[in-house]
Curated annotation (Swiss-Prot):
NCBIfam families: PRK04290.1-1. This is Small ribosomal subunit protein eS6. SMART domains: Ribosomal_S6e (SM01405). InterPro entries: Ribosomal_eS6, Ribosomal_eS6_arc, Ribosomal_eS6_CS. It comes from Saccharolobus islandicus (strain M.14.25 / Kamchatka #1). GO terms for cellular component: ribonucleoprotein complex; ribosome. GO terms for molecular function: structural constituent of ribosome. It holds the Pfam family Ribosomal_S6e. GO terms for biological process: translation. Belongs to the eukaryotic ribosomal protein eS6 family. Disulfide bonds: none annotated. Keywords: Ribonucleoprotein, Ribosomal protein.
Amino acid sequence: MPDFKIVISDPQSVEPKRIKVKAKANDQIKSIAGEKEGKAVPQAKVNEKTKQLLNIDTLITLEITKQEGDKKVKVKSHFKVEVDNNVPDNEVWISKTMAEKFGAEDFEAIAYRTKTLQISIDQDKATNLVGLKIGDTFEANQLIGLPVKLKITGGSDNSGFPMRFDVTGAAKRKILLSGPPGFYPNEDGERRRKTIRGNTISQEIVQINTIIVR
């Protein structure tokens, strides 16, 4: 059975400021089970000045570009931020496990406020979301360890059929659509009959899209 995916977007992170930082593995930052595989949000520490400079609320992204053969590849990870004023300016402390993902324990990276991230959770944990509808909110702390409230904006089932906010229930239905989600017309006024899911999360839903609400 595939993992259940939660896509989280921060609507206040439109054009985040990007700065060059030094990222370091630090023994104070404990690894969290699943963080390297995207099943948990890893922790990072910055000082208050760096947090304010980047206008960070809860999440920070670190990004590097490295050479792999004849290609340049971007590597990035998202972290839950904790303030620690023992961390020098323009420096980010992370766990050794996450440093391995970047290929070094001490490296330069671009840091910015996270715009979007995806977390995978086991299907048994996802049962807590069954019955919720598009537009509903839930606390993410117990589910994925993030101290934020999330609002459901959409999702898709195990066949890739999207949820529709304007169709009540959880069943799969074939309806006439004039726009997204589920259909993107090539011409004005074009309509097409498409298969979609209703607005309610069921056992068949494998991904939901959410935004942070404050």
